[in-house]
Amino acid sequence: MSLLSIITIGLAGLGGLVNGQRDLSVELGVASNFAILAKAGISSVPDSAILGDIGVSPAAATYITGFGLTQDSSTTYATSPQVTGLIYAADYSTPTPNYLAAAVANAETAYNQAAGFVDPDFLELGAGELRDQTLVPGLYKWTSSVSVPTDLTFEGNGDATWVFQIAGGLSLADGVAFTLAGGANSTNIAFQVGDDVTVGKGAHFEGVLLAKRFVTLQTGSSLNGRVLSQTEVALQKATVNSPFVPAPEVVQKRSNARQWL
């Protein structure tokens, strides 16, 4: 084999790497505009605090409870003292239904993309119990549920990516904290979870939750990232901070939906 052939094969083997690391980026599409997006409903035990937009589809606005909604005169969105952002529902006026349908479809595509990565770097780590771990970038896979009884650290540079494929549920114990180190970015950490997700009282979560089922953020818990659920999301005096906070002119463009569809 010639030296050129060896070099060519070596370069081909680097495909999909970012700064020498495997690229596991998950594309959220229009769903990236939301702090919380759910198909069946979003509830709050007041007062919760959400930085970013929230939306439900195909559910109607009556399935957004505990927020004290005030609908805008355009009837395309609503507001709430608990939400620094806009609130969308499938029964609001055009073009909101199409905007939400696109976001939900993109969230489902992202879930499937995350579930579709192969050749995990870590399989059944800790037999489903993550205790006092520092997690390096890579693909993690479990065929059952995962519990987190103690703090976790995600260590990697700003381009590093993590994907966690969890066939069962995910639960964080009360007071557990996810910590980022080395420049790690919460938008590059994706959890694809096939069953219910529970973030315990006072616990802190970092990353994007791609959840097949119910997500509960218990009293005093917080999440830096996004919650994209294919069923419902329940907040109990919880905090969600999204990396995307629209400027006023972007809000207006999004209301018109021309920018997104």
Curated annotation (Swiss-Prot):
Q: How is it modified after translation?
A: Glycosylated. Glycosylation is not required for the thermal hysteresis (TH) activity. Glycosylation may increase stability and secretion of this protein.
Query: Which keywords, in A-to-Z order, does the entry hold?
Result: Antifreeze protein, Glycoprotein, Secreted, Signal, Stress response
Location of site Ice-binding? T65, S147, A234
InterPro entries xrefs: Ice-bd_prot (IPR021884)
- Which biotechnological use is given in the entry? Improves cryopreservation of the human red blood cells (RBCs). Almost 90 % hemolysis damage induced to RBCs by freeze thawing with the slow warming at 22 degrees Celsius is dramatically decreased to less than 16 % when 0.4 or 0.8 mg/ml of this protein is used as a cryoprotectant. The post-thaw cell counts of RBCs frozen in the presence of 0.8 mg/ml of this protein and thawed by slow warming at 22 degrees Celsius is almost the same as that of non-frozen intact RBCs, whereas the recovery of RBCs frozen in its absence is less than 30 %.
GO CC terms of this entry? extracellular region
Signal as a keyword? yes
Q: Where in the cell is it found?
A: Secreted
Name the consequence of T109Y. Has 92% thermal hysteresis (TH) activity of that of the wild-type
Single annotated GO MF: ice binding
Give the positions annotated as glycosylation sites: N185
Q: How changing T239Y affects the protein?
A: No effect on thermal hysteresis (TH) activity
Task: List the Pfam families.
Answer: Ice_binding
Where does the signal peptide begin and end?
1-20
Give the similarity note: Belongs to the ice-binding protein family.
- Subunit composition and interactions: Homodimer. Dimerization is not required for the thermal hysteresis (TH) activity.
Task: Give the function comment from the record.
Answer: Confers freeze tolerance. Binds to the surface of ice crystals and inhibits their growth. Has low thermal hysteresis (TH) activity, which is the ability to lower the freezing point of an aqueous solution below its melting point. The TH activity of this protein is approximately 0.2 degrees Celsius at 50 uM and 0.3 degrees Celsius at 400 uM.
Indicate what this protein is called per its UniProt record: Ice-binding protein
* Protein source organism: Leucosporidium sp. (strain AY30) (Arctic yeast)
Gene name?
AFP
